[in-house]
Regions:
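Glycine-rich FAD pyrophosphate-binding loop
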Residues: 58-62, 69-94
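Conserved FAD-binding catalytic core of PHBH/FMO-like flavoproteins
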Residues: 194-364
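Conserved phosphate-binding and hydrolysis motifs of nucleotide-dependent enzymes
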Residues: 61-66, 215, 372, 385
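Generic enzyme active-site microenvironment
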Residues: 82-83, 212, 371
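Conserved N-terminal helical subregion
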Residues: 52-54, 104, 113-235, 249-254, ...
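Extreme N-terminal leader/targeting segments of oxidoreductases
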Residues: 1-57, 72-76, 547
Length: 551
């Protein structure tokens, strides 16, 4: 046996037996053992290695967020072990439009070439259609380089390019497997993950920091929320009786630690082939009844159509979906796209995706971090998800870069509390705008909501700052929550002014008052969920000023 083979054999045996003989070894072992890459629960062949030895960071999920994080941390010299459930090319109907603000973050990460060879299409803004009228809303890109614009593409092609670029780095080990649970030390610190490989073997992986970014259907989200901690505290107190059960039912956030996912609607996805958009290089938003319809190009020959269906129930694809699309939706499609839309329905391949929304409610867990859609979701109407995720990756990279030793979990956790505050300008602006616009653009029988919807379209049609300001917010180019609130209420008061002029009446004054109340009722719950203080007064929070732990 060669010297290298003997060392590898001894290394694997050592890490197999130490946990069995000394269950608490993680608390006393040196950093190399605490961050061991894999402790085998049975005799299994080694996974493909991008590097030998211990990992500094485990990344769960290799989507947009996970791949970008692995790449940027590895470029900084961190050893990253990526565990992804399925390394085949994803086939999704969302995550296909990257806003200009997100493209700027790609440039910061050095990943802008990932959109160069996938037939990605430049996006220069939006066109709104409503009741036979249309208005063009270009992105305010005058101050940026000519290459800066939005991009639309096949999500799977984009993700595969990012995975390939990350996996090519020496310090990235990318492995296919399903993470089933987080490994905890003393029910306090997360020290790694347990996962199942594609051939069914159960393995454990250890690292000082585990970053969960396994998407909107994350099965680890609740693990970081620790609902059993709340429940366990009640059990230990001896006060578990009927009144406690009632309070848990009445206040589920206490039990579920605020990890609630709302599904306000679903997208029905189609691909239109070999057709021309009325305005090339623009996203098309039809303000239809009952809710918006989107069109945007995802390749030189394909146009994505997303039909929003509000509520938790949608017609079944096999029985009623085609009839619904032809009877209810087709008549509201622009004439230039109607034939291609009907042809796409006849071809089949109709896809449905629930539109999830979840405000970010962090539970600070030493050794673990939640990012991407696993951490924070908003309605995909505005296409802001990837922009928020990439912005978070840039911020997290900059925060971790000066940290020399990741093994001090409690100090690192306390320092990374600043992440949740510093991300708020970009994330809360896009999240709030997405939720508010969806509610404003959806049809309602209420007169005040109808007036607010019409006022929003007419306000954006004014052009200049009235369209440029909101579009800069939506695109991630101007992440200022206060600017968002000012524009939103400017729309409301614009609607009131139109209603009262030239001759106000008592009835119109009443509707005008209800418009303002309606606007407040739409935006305030979203802002409250995001955190009023975090959005508008982040510098008043001590975590904003956290310094990195001493080396």
């Amino acid at each position: 046996m060669s010297q290298s083979a003997f060392f590898k054999f001894s290394y694997n045996k050592l890490h197999h037996h130490i946990p069995l003989l000394f269950p608490n070894y993680l608390s006393i072992a040196p950093p190399l053992l605490r961050t061991t890459a894999a402790v085998r629960s049975n005799a299994a062949p080694d996974p493909p290695l991008g590097f030998l030895g211990a990992a500094d960071v485990i990344v769960v999920g290799a989507g947009v967020a996970g791949s970008a994080l692995a790449y940027t941390l590895a470029k900084d010299g961190r050893r990253v072990h990526v565990i992804e459930r399925d390394l085949r090319e994803p086939d999704r109907i969302v995550g296909e439009l990257l806003q200009p603000g997100g493209y700027l973050k790609l440039i910061e990460l050095g990943l802008e070439d990932c959109v160069d060879q996938i037939d990605a299409q430049r996006v220069l803004g939006y066109v709104l259609f409503m009741d036979g009228k249309k208005t063009k809303l270009p992105y305010p890109l005058e101050k940026f380089h000519a290459e800066v614009a939005g991009r639309s593409f096949h999500n799977g092609r984009f993700v595969q390019m990012m995975r390939e670029k990350a996996a090519a780095l020496q310090f990235v080990r990318m492995e296919q497997g399903t993470v089933t649970s987080l490994l905890e030390q003393d029910n306090k610190n997360v020290v790694g993950v347990q996962y199942r490989t594609k051939d069914g073997q159960q393995l454990k992986a250890y690292a000082p920091l585990t970053v969960i970014c396994d998407g909107c259907f994350s099965n680890l989200r609740r693990s970081l929320c620790h609902p059993k901690a709340q429940f366990g505290d009640v059990m230990k107190s001896g006060r578990f009786d009927l009144s406690v059960c009632t309070s848990l039912l009445e206040s589920p956030n206490m039990f579920l630690a605020t990890c609630q996912v709302e599904v306000p609607s679903s997208f029905v996805g189609l691909v239109l082939e070999n057709c021309q958009l009325p305005f090339e290089n623009y996203g098309h938003v039809i303000l239809a009844d009952p809710s918006p319809i989107l069109f945007y190009r995802i390749s030189s020959t394909e146009v994505r159509c997303l039909v929003d269906i509000p509520g938790p129930k949608v017609p079944l694809v096999r029985s009623g979906m085609a009839n619904y699309l032809k009877a209810t939706v087709a008549s509201q499609i622009p004439p230039e796209l109607k034939d291609a839309f009907l042809s796409a329905i006849d071809r089949g391949n109709i896809r449905i995706m629930p539109n999830s929304s979840m405000p970010a409610e962090p539970y600070h867990t030493p050794g673990a971090l939640l990012i991407g859609d696993a951490f924070n979701m908003r309605h995909p109407l505005t296409g802001g998800g990837m922009t928020v995720a990439l912005s978070d990756i840039v911020l997290l990279r900059d925060l971790i870069k000066p940290v020399g030793d990741l093994n001090d979990a409690s100090s690192l956790c306390r320092y990374l509390e600043s992440f949740y505050i510093l991300r708020k300008p970009m994330a809360s602006t896009i999240n709030t705008l997405a939720g508010a616009l969806y509610k404003v653009f959806s049809v309602s029988p209420d007169d005040a909501r109808k007036e607010l919807r019409q006022a929003c379209f007419d306000y954006l049609s004014l052009g200049k700052i009235f369209s440029g300001g909101p579009i800069a917010l939506l695109s991630g180019l101007n992440p200022y929550p206060l600017s968002l609130v000012l524009h939103f209420f400017a729309v409301a008061f614009y609607g009131v002014g139109r209603l009262l002029l030239p001759f106000p009446s008592f009835e119109r004054m009443w509707v005008g008052a209800r418009i303002v109340l309606c606007a407040f009722g739409i935006i305030f719950p979203i802002i409250k969920a995001e955190g009023i203080r975090q959005m508008f007064l982040p510098t008043s929070i001590p975590a904003f000023y956290r310094a990195p732990p001493l080396r």
